Amino acid sequence: MNICILDGYTTNPGDVSWAPLEALGNVTIYELTKPEDIAERAKDAEILITNKTVLSAETINALPKLQYIGTLSTGFNVIDCEAAKQRGIPVCNVPTYCTTAVAQFTFAMLFNITNKVELHNQSVHKGDWVNSRHF
């Protein structure tokens, strides 16, 4: 199985192992891919994985061996899903990516707004607390 990752650097700058994918077949990883380079880089791909690299209908139709498209994101906005559907190519995403981190960030922002965390942080850094006669 030939697996092509078009923009591996966007999700793995080197701190994650690609070994699970490599166990499935021949994996070729490109850090980033320009639109004009997709057809050449993915010409033998049966599995194509992207994150930010756009896969247009023209691109999808130019890859005769393509059997599967995966996006390393929650959204499908970079893939022409209709073109893939017409070719019978499944397209999958990572729907639970960052769910916990998004929830944590949401609560952090709520605390920042309700407790004025940033205002107090700036006050401490300006020396307001250490210079206050009450502390």
Positions of the model-derived regions?
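Short beta->alpha connector loops at strand-helix junctions that form conserved
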Residues: E31, L72-S73, I89-T100
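Rossmann-fold NAD(P) dinucleotide-binding segment
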Residues: V54-L66, D80-C81
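Short acidic/histidine-rich motifs immediately flanking catalytic phosphotransfer sites
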Residues: A42-I47, P64-Q67
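Rossmann-fold NAD(P)-binding glycine/threonine-rich loop
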Residues: N77-I89
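N-terminal glycine-/charge-rich "phosphate-binding" loop or analogous flexible N-terminal tail
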Residues: M1-A45
